[in-house]
UniProtKB/Swiss-Prot annotation:
Organism: Oryza sativa subsp. japonica (Rice)
One GO MF term: structural constituent of chromatin
Keyword terms, alphabetized: Acetylation, Centromere, Chromosome, DNA-binding, Kinetochore, Methylation, Nucleosome core
Function in brief: Histone H3-like variant which exclusively replaces conventional H3 in the nucleosome core of centromeric chromatin at the inner plate of the kinetochore. Required for recruitment and assembly of kinetochore proteins, mitotic progression and chromosome segregation.
Protein name: Histone H3-like centromeric protein CENH3
Taxonomic classification: Eukaryota, Viridiplantae, Streptophyta, Embryophyta, Tracheophyta
Modified sites of kind N6,N6-dimethyllysine: K5, K30
Residues annotated with N6-methyllysine modification: K5, K19, K30
Major place of residence: nucleus
Gene responsible for this protein: CENH3
Signal peptide limits: none
Coiled-coil residue spans: none
Keyword Transmembrane in annotation: no
Stretches with biased composition (Low complexity): 40-55
Pfam families cross-referenced by the UniProt entry: Histone (PF00125)
Residue ranges of the region described as Disordered: 1-71
């Protein structure tokens, strides 16, 4: 028996979507609130479709902002950050964190030189980048593209790092 092509069957037409009305606000205006009116007077009805001079309003089409496809901006940012050499963690919050940690563990050490803080920040960022690289490899090995907590835990276990 020969195969035949069956045309697509259309269902009944769906109701048209409700259009949003940006000209009128659902909230009552100041004049309506002050006068206690219900908003059904002739002045409010005629003002909805006309401007202050009495001419009908023309609707202006607003262009949608351009959106890139998912992942395009992420890849662009990856390339940008791979090219740069500056530190990505802001210095002030990092130095506050270092001072907070040193206050917690040692009351003797209270002052840090700028070079010591910069060296510590450089090492911390390198460590984070290394962890993320190995975690990404673990996620790819699991046939995923999203890094999960278990990837980071596995990366730390395999790398021989301490559990803290």
């Amino acid at each position: 028996m020969a195969r035949t092509k069956h045309p697509a069957v259309r269902k009944s037409k769906a109701e048209p979507k409700k259009k949003l009305q940006f000209e009128r606000s659902p909230r009552p205006s100041k004049a309506q609130r002050a006068g206690g009116g219900t908003g059904t007077s002739a002045t409010t009805r005629s003002a909805a479709g006309t401007s202050a001079s009495g001419t009908p309003r023309q609707q202006t089409k607003q262009r949608k902002p351009h959106r890139f496809r998912p992942g395009t901006v992420a890849l662009r940012e990856i390339r940008k950050f791979q090219k740069t050499t500056e530190l990505l963690i802001p210095f002030a919050p990092f130095s506050r964190l270092v001072r907070e940690i040193t206050d917690f563990y040692s009351k003797d050490v209270s002052r840090w030189t700028l070079e010591a803080l910069l060296a510590l920040q450089e090492a911390a960022e390198y460590h984070l980048v290394d962890i993320f690289e190995v975690s990404n490899l673990c996620a790819i090995h699991a046939k995923r593209v999203t890094i999960m907590q278990k990837d980071m835990q596995l990366a730390r276990r395999i790398g021989g790092r301490r559990p803290w």
